[in-house]
Amino acid sequence: LQLRVKEILDQYAELRMSGERATQLLDQHMQQVTVKENRDQLEAVVDEIKLRLNWNTLDRMADYLRLSDDAALKPEQKLALAISGWLLGGGAGIENLGTALPLFQVRNLVLEYLKTDTVDLQRRREILEQLAQLEGSGPEFLAKLIAHMAPPLDPPQLSEEDTIGGLFQLSVPMGDAPPLKYLIQLPPEYDPLRRYPTVLSLHDANTTPAMQIDWWAGIYNQDRKR
């Protein structure tokens, strides 16, 4: 058991060092790059990577870290690998910054489209027209962008009394019928950029949604945690 614990701790230490190295390399390559066009967009996506890079997303930097010391690649190409890996996932690295950078704009437009109220058809049509003009808006890119982006909507802002150990009660409008309410139990370390296995549990006539959550996740302890 001690050997297994040591192995896990060593893995965490290695991941931490890789994350720190990725951040340092991003700063270094940003200083070396000579790109002036869309510089603000380049800075925005690099800032996002540095802010949200963690153990759950470090695998997206695999191509970038592997080729970061390749003297044959320019700083622009290395940043393209970092950006495309961040947006599309590990193994999807693109060395052309002119192809990788528009993916950031495409991703942001997709997020805006999903956030826009369904009754605002005009704005949604405008977003679709913008997407049609951008490189990287094809189905093969959109599928990967959506799979690796954060949820379009923020979780509901609840008081500490209403939010017990990651438990949320949400509802879905059902037209003329009353809203459909349901419960979601998130794990303590929940990260929206990590993929988790999901259990969809339907209660029967003799139980309640809360009882189903208790059965799968356990009951609360004194610290209001499961």
Regions found by a protein language model. Give the residues of each.
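Active-site machinery of serine-nucleophile hydrolases
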Residues: 198, 202-226
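A domain-start/cap signature at the N-terminus of enzymes
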Residues: 4-196
